[in-house]
């Protein structure tokens, strides 16, 4: 199996406003740059606010734009992972107005009949529109970190919601793999989106991990958290599949500046965040990629393509979430940061046969049920063991 290189994508001049302000020429240029760096997959996001503006109403214009973006990516030789239910994105929850009551409280995504039917209609419509895309669709990702938008009220609710959407996509686009965009709370908290439950619905086991958002990480630049999270995901899934790191990355300080810590807004809470120097970011990406290969990951999707144009800084989410402005491998002016060269060199080595994946370490020493009785304690305990083994020259197992 070849280690897969992917990139999460929003355009640098449009960010989350890409669908309502779509510039296909801009997307075409950026997809060409993404392919040139060495990526083979792009993950894009059908923002629910744009695609589902009313109950039981999918905006056909937005679906057509998604089809066009997939076609443009395919022209560049890229395959696409469309994420279909996107409420939580880049430090903001993008609720469609109809999902909020007069007091601003959201509908129950997991039990409200109209909300469920509407979400199922959206994923079905997108899957049907793209099922004949000539192999351009790498997979359908059902959702992005949905529990940050609204935590399922129970394990059964989370599992049932994913199963409904997964079954809907499978009927609409048979044979296309299904992913579910999960993040660290599925490993470290009782968020009712258990990895073993997701593994029974999806065709791939995957995770998002950032030291920036993890109190167990040893530093903002800790290179072990991502490979550990990947290996733990594989252990909890219990499928024997190689795990995919669907999101990892870090934000950077301005070009030529040293790294600095800031206090930033994280979904309404103040949190320290680190803007790495561009050289630190390159070193981090190199270290994490090498560890992911050594510990048997299926691949890695960096977050994200580009920094955003300063003209977007007075609009949500970038007006409040400062870190989200500069997660890119490419600067807002289109020039590449040193981290882009890390991926370009990695792709060259991979294609030359110099990248050899190891086996996934067995890090889990309890059953999934036992683990989820106290996930925070087990996560910290197992990570400590992993780091101790790594410091002694092992692979964390």
Regions found by a protein language model. Give the residues of each.
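Generic structural signal for well-ordered alpha-helical scaffold segments
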Residues: 127-131, 231-234, 289
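Active-site mouth of glycoside hydrolases
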Residues: 1-202, 240, 309-312
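Aromatic-rich peripheral "rim/lid" segments of glycoside hydrolase catalytic domains that contact
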Residues: 18, 99, 119, 284, ...
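Histidine/acidic-residue-rich catalytic or RNA/ligand-binding cores of hydrolases
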Residues: 253-269, 280, 284-285, 312-320
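Amphipathic alpha-helical segments in well-structured domains
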Residues: 63-66, 158-162, 226, 281-285, ...
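A short acidic, glycine-rich active-site loop
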Residues: 104-117, 269-283, 327-332
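Short, solvent-exposed beta-strand-terminating loops
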Residues: 82-93, 249-259, 299-312
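Glycoside hydrolase catalytic-domain groove-lining segments
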Residues: 160, 164-166, 173-266, 293, ...
């Amino acid at each position: 199996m070849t280690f897969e290189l992917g990139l999460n994508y929003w355009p640098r001049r449009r960010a989350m406003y890409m669908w309502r302000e779509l510039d296909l020429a801009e997307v075409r240029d950026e997809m060409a740059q993404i392919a040139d760096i060495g990526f083979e997959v792009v993950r894009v996001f059908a923002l629910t606010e744009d695609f589902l503006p009313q109950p039981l109403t999918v905006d056909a214009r937005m679906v057509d734009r998604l089809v066009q973006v997939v076609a443009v990516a395919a022209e560049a030789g890229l395959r696409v992972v469309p994420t279909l239910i996107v409420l939580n994105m880049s430090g903001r929850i993008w609720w469609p107005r109809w999902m909020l009551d007069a007091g601003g409280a959201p509908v129950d995504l997991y039990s409200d009949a109209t909300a469920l039917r509407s979400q199922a209609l959206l994923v079905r419509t997108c899957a049907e529109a793209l099922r004949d895309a000539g192999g351009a669709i790498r997979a359908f990702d059902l959702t992005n970190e949905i529990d940050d938008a609204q935590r399922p009220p129970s394990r059964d609710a989370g599992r049932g919601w994913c199963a409904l959407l997964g079954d809907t996509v499978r009927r609409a686009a048979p044979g296309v793999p299904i992913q579910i965009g999960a993040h660290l709370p599925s490993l470290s908290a009782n968020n009712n989106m258990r990895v073993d439950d997701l593994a029974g619905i999806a065709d791939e086991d995957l995770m998002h991990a950032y030291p920036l958002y993890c109190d167990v990480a040893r530093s903002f630049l800790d290179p072990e958290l991502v490979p550990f999270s990947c290996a733990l995901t594989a252990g909890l899934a219990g499928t024997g599949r190689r795990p995919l790191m669907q999101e990892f990355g870090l934000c950077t300080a301005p070009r030529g500046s040293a790294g600095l810590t800031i206090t930033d807004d994280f979904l309404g809470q103040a949190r320290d965040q680190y803007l790495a120097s561009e050289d630190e970011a390159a070193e981090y990406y190199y270290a994490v990629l090498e560890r992911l290969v050594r510990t048997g990951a299926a691949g890695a999707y960096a977050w994200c393509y580009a920094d955003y144009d300063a003209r977007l800084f007075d609009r949500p989410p970038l007006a409040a979430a400062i870190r989200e402005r500069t997660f890119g491998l490419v600067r807002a002016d289109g020039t590449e940061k040193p981290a882009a060269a890390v991926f370009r060199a990695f792709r060259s080595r991979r294609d030359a046969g110099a990248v050899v994946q190891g086996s996934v370490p067995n890090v889990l020493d309890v059953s999934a049920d036992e683990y989820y009785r106290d996930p925070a304690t087990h996560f910290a305990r197992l990570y400590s063991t992993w780091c101790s083994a790594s410091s002694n020259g092992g692979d964390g197992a």
